[in-house]
A protein has these predicted regions:
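Conserved Lys-Pro-Asp/Glu-containing loop-to-beta segment of HAD-superfamily phosphomonoesterases
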Residues: 137-159
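Short acidic capping loops at alpha-helix termini that bridge into adjacent secondary structure
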Residues: 33-34, 123-127, 155-158
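Distinct, well-ordered alpha-helical segments
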Residues: 112-119
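Short, conserved loop/helix-junction motifs that constitute active-site signature segments
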Residues: 93-96, 120-124, 153-154
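Hydrophobic "anchor" residues on beta-strands that sit immediately upstream
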Residues: 4, 102, 159
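N-terminal helical cap/lid subdomain that shapes the substrate entry/recognition surface
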Residues: 2-90, 97, 108-112
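A short, structured active-site edge motif that brings together acidic residues
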Residues: 37-41, 106, 123-134
Length: 159
């Protein structure tokens, strides 16, 4: 019997629109032709594991630009890539009475602070697990084991 429901944040509770950010960087001369390679070079996975801060990540991004980037604008554009998926917030809220509901997300510190302030993520559900806080990202087993431990989950009763 299912007793626990886990939602992701980006792409589930919040629609991810990163295209404007990529276009902004490309216009500043950052080579965005191979997005997966760029994400590796900039260290996104390390950022989402909490090994580098959002400020450090944006410094790396700015250093890749051929033309100087205004740090405030860069940060604003970095933070402005999510839109609330109202139907998913309603679903998560609606399940709270009958299930234990959690959030599990690959996310860095800066995005988490911004999204929590904007949408109340930490108070929305029974518990949250942000990758930067535990030093592990999906799909590694470590983050799922931490969710099991922290939320006292039984995998067979969790979706």
């Amino acid at each position: 019997m299912i007793r626990n429901v886990i939602f992701d944040v980006g792409g589930v509770l919040l629609r991810l629109r990163y295209r404007p950010f990529i276009e902004y960087l490309a216009a500043a001369g950052v080579d965005m032709s191979d997005l997966p390679a760029w994400l590796t070079r900039v260290g996104l996975a390390a950022h989402e594991r909490g090994e580098i801060t959002g400020e450090e990540l944006l410094e790396r991004v700015a250093a890749m630009a051929r033309t100087p980037l205004d740090r405030s604008e860069l940060q604003a554009r970095w933070l402005d890539m999510f839109d609330r998926a109202h139907e998913m917030f309603e679903l998560a809220s609606g399940l709270m009475a009958d299930y234990r509901v959690y959030l599990l997300s690959n996310i860095g510190d800066m995005h988490w602070r911004h999204l929590d302030a904007q949408y109340g993520l930490d108070d929305l559900v029974h518990g949250t697990l942000a990758s930067f806080r535990v030093g592990a990202i999906k799909p590694t087993a470590a983050i799922y084991r931490e969710a099991e431990r922290r939320f006292e989950l039984e995998p067979a009763a969790t979706v």
